[in-house]
């Protein structure tokens, strides 16, 4: 037994209690989410994907830039989407990403990724409230998967 000696390392994570960084407003619609996050997603030269971690009353706890891609795609690793939600003890999450052009049309990848995230959120009991695509510089328009593709949240269709 003395042949192997291991050093035990204790690691602890602590979230500091600070004032909200960007909003204390309740987010109940896709447009409200865009208003809150516009300054972080506007005028980007490539696609960004971010997650807003929400408390039980749909107030933002914090947000996390999950990935930065190129001009027409950003990879979205599932573990990165839920990591900050778990560490923040979030009750739910909201996913947003930008399209660098003016098109709000979701790609096949966007649809597939949304479905995977909704299913993963169900498994972890951290619901995905919506996945919102924004485009252009004013962000007066957005594409809400929850509003436009509600079947993605239907467990009977997508168990």
PLM regions and their residue ranges:
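Glycine-rich, small/polar surface segments that engage phosphate groups of diverse ligands
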Residues: 22-84
């Amino acid at each position: 037994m003395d042949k192997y000696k291991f050093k035990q390392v204790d690691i602890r994570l602590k979230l500091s209690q600070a004032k909200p960084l960007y909003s204390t407003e309740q987010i109940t619609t896709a447009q409200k989410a865009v208003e809150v996050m516009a300054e972080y997603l506007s005028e980007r030269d490539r696609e960004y994907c971010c997650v807003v971690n929400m408390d039980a009353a749909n107030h933002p706890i914090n947000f996390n830039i999950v990935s930065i891609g190129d001009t027409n795609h950003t990879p979205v690793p599932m573990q990165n989407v839920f990591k900050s939600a778990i560490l923040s003890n979030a009750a739910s999450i909201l996913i947003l990403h930008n399209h660098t052009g003016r098109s709000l049309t979701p790609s096949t990848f966007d649809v597939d990724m949304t479905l995977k995230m909704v299913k993963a959120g169900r498994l972890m009991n951290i619901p995905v409230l919506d996945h919102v695509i924004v485009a252009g510089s004013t962000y007066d328009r957005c594409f809400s998967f929850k509003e436009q593709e509600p079947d993605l949240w239907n467990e009977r269709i997508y168990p």
